């Protein structure tokens, strides 16, 4: 598996088909023409920073989970671990497993860390045409700025009602 460079703003987002925590297939291109996608890669289910971020999304950022926006959170954890993680944290949005082939989607987005065997903490906002409109990459221990993501989404989708 070859690590590609991360897609730049204005480029087509690589399509993928992954299973969520319930074993359901989720294909990025199925949202084209319907929803803006917030694609959040995170290193590990159950880790302190990742758990805190996803709980913050659940509690404080409804703009990341709405009728016009679809949040897809991706890690290299197996689906069974993601199911337990979602259940324990009461996470209703899709947690996608990039477990096998291990890190294939993270590699397509240029965010796979082969030494740690996980995705780096990165976010891509993808418009309804499947084009990357914003991306940010954070260091492993640093939580992402969810408020900034909200501002970018407001520019793409309009203010929350």
Residue ranges and their predicted role:
Residues 1-161:
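Chalcogenol-based redox active-site neighborhoods
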